[in-house]
Amino acid sequence: MLCVTIRIKRNDELNGKRLHKLLIDFLIQNKVAGSTVWTGVDGFGKRKRSTIQLEGITINMPLIIEIIDEKSKLESLLPSLKRLVNDNGLVTIHEVDVV
């Protein structure tokens, strides 16, 4: 099994739609076994700090999208996932043992 992890920001958009929603829709359409979107508390990277505080409200938090499925399935989807994420985030892969 393979795990693809995508790190983006909550406010990232593509064609006027939130990127994390586009990614989840894409994964459902391609019948991926499972995916979870995690909200981060704080973070930073090449696009600077991920979290912004406005009058006590946290916005634009980092998001982590974990995707798990068979290696052959996810490897075939990687080019499309990279194209969707583009320069908005980071895509990593690693093998996992599901117990």
Kindly give the residue locations of the regions a language model identified.
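Positively charged, small/polar-rich N-terminal and surface patches that mediate targeting and assembly
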Residues: 1-99
